[in-house]
């Protein structure tokens, strides 16, 4: 661990322990323990838990005896138990020790999540390898990646330069909020390799409730790899602070986020055969295409979503929630997000030599064809900001879980600012492009019965920038129960008509310049999934039709495809369990009608085989196994450092290589630990040494990785 990392570690640890100390004191004041030897106190506590999960406290007199209700008026101090009154959460959620959710920035809803305390996928330390069949990547932690599953690839149109870092970043749309009956802290650290080439990740999260309905959380994550190849280093750091109140009538979710990216760009190996030939004895000696290119990006944002409810049926003191009452809500959402980026290099640092297998130089080339501004060096900067205001109304006819649960309607105003240097700015001065967009949207959702629920959303841009853009999304679930075990059939339909990204239309830098006038692109999505949790079965069919699709072609610049492109996918997840033996399979089949526009592997798979057992029952759980990823050969997307964008290269195919990790994971009470031999397959397959996930970017070499996660909830 470097001195800088240690310094950050010490400061973060000090803050966390200080918060834990304060939280422990606050918890002691709010949640006194019940004497388990007193049956009267136990009975009262159990009854109060039935009525309200947060009611469990019995007032005691000076002798330690419980004060009954009739005597409380004479007590010197009376503690009023405040319940969790929110209409967002039902009784089953309220009774959880910890639960987590994400606030919807369009409507008065939240989306529930899972608290990470289990062994499941704990050893998968690369964030981009967790979902289904994983991502194609540049081989290091803190580097860019793009999903092999086309239907998960980022498809936004705001600051697309950082799409390759989607799995790391905290945004207002995915910032998490926690409710905890006790203060909750997670501290996790992982490392691998020699200090010179080490990979490290550090995660610290603290969440605490001030009252049962009010809480805050702090999150800090950093992912860092020094790399084993020349000029290979990546680092992503993110921070978020959130606060919420989910009261009986008023709710608010607010927070700030910050993300920073620093990436040394080496452009990949000069020649793929360098990886397997004996000409170079070590990875550090292999020539790379660039030796001084650097990308840096920084993001700062804040958000606040609030709503006030007006019940149309009188509420009583015994009613904890408005969820089952006729009511309407008036709400407001505001967010601000700014990204800034800088790319730098030199002509000398981007020039490389081509050699034969004896080491003789046969050619000299530069990574870039064009040097528009300066023939010797690049220093490209640009920025984008978005200020969003939304005002919405939500109608709740009679019950949030009813046939017509809620109907939302709102209007929004987005203010965009784009900043980049152009040659004409030498004459006119630095200029900022500003756009305003005005739109309306609606949302409806309900639950016909325990067998059927549905949801629909529509947004239409009325005027200004991106006028005429349409976004429609509808989904539903059907439930069938066999011996109380659910079988879930889900469907989703989506349609989008949208203006291409500002940066696909206008871009100026030392290496790339374009001004386009692309038409609106359209996308139609259809998904059908069948899930049988008791059998470990998940089957999904996906179909996407792309019209006027904007993509980055073989020359790494944006183009628009006039014809319709279709992408079809079939996903299967089947988990088998035989006692402690688990055999988990994830397989994805995909087909694109035009591989030069949308390139996907025909088959991609992730297999996880492990044995799980408890050496000490209910105290120590151990998991030993292997994870493997594989995909068939295809023309994987290339990565362009100057634009931070993926493009459809047609030079080299990658794939047909099994990437395998072997690991041991254990959970002892509140601590999880793991030891992993990463890329264990490096020397197992003599014919598969050309191990690439992206063209010219080899996987990291085999190394031993270890780490731990410790959570505190007291």
Which residue stretches match the model-derived regions?
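A generic structural signal for short coil/turn motifs at secondary-structure boundaries
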Residues: 16, 21-24, 194, 226-230, ...
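Membrane-proximal, glycine/serine-rich, low-complexity loop/turn segments characteristic
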Residues: 29-300, 309-323, 479-481, 485-486, ...
